[in-house]
Amino acid sequence: FLPIIAKLLGGLL
């Protein structure tokens, strides 16, 4: 899993 995507998901969640 890409850290960038994880950061985006973290922002949404």
UniProtKB/Swiss-Prot annotation:
<comment type="similarity">
    <text>Belongs to the MCD family. Crabrolin subfamily.</text>
</comment>
<keyword id="KW-0800">Toxin</keyword>
<dbReference type="GO" id="GO:0045087">
    <property type="term" value="P:innate immune response"/>
</dbReference>
<keyword id="KW-0027">Amidation</keyword>
<dbReference type="GO" id="GO:0006935">
    <property type="term" value="P:chemotaxis"/>
</dbReference>
<keyword id="KW-0295">Fungicide</keyword>
<comment type="function">
    <text>Antimicrobial peptide against bacteria and fungi. Mast cell degranulating peptide. Induces the chemotaxis of neutrophils. Its mast cell degranulation activity may be related to the activation of G-protein coupled receptors in mast cells as well as interaction with other proteins located in cell endosomal membranes in the mast cells.</text>
</comment>
<feature type="modified residue" description="Leucine amide">
    <location>
        <position position="13"/>
    </location>
</feature>
<protein>
    <recommendedName>
        <fullName>Vespid chemotactic peptide X</fullName>
    </recommendedName>
</protein>
<keyword id="KW-0964">Secreted</keyword>
<keyword id="KW-0044">Antibiotic</keyword>
<keyword id="KW-0677">Repeat</keyword>
<keyword id="KW-0145">Chemotaxis</keyword>
<keyword id="KW-1213">G-protein coupled receptor impairing toxin</keyword>
<dbReference type="GO" id="GO:0050832">
    <property type="term" value="P:defense response to fungus"/>
</dbReference>
<keyword id="KW-0467">Mast cell degranulation</keyword>
<keyword id="KW-0391">Immunity</keyword>
<dbReference type="GO" id="GO:0090729">
    <property type="term" value="F:toxin activity"/>
</dbReference>
<dbReference type="GO" id="GO:0005576">
    <property type="term" value="C:extracellular region"/>
</dbReference>
<keyword id="KW-0399">Innate immunity</keyword>
<dbReference type="GO" id="GO:0042742">
    <property type="term" value="P:defense response to bacterium"/>
</dbReference>
<keyword id="KW-0929">Antimicrobial</keyword>
<dbReference type="GO" id="GO:0031640">
    <property type="term" value="P:killing of cells of another organism"/>
</dbReference>
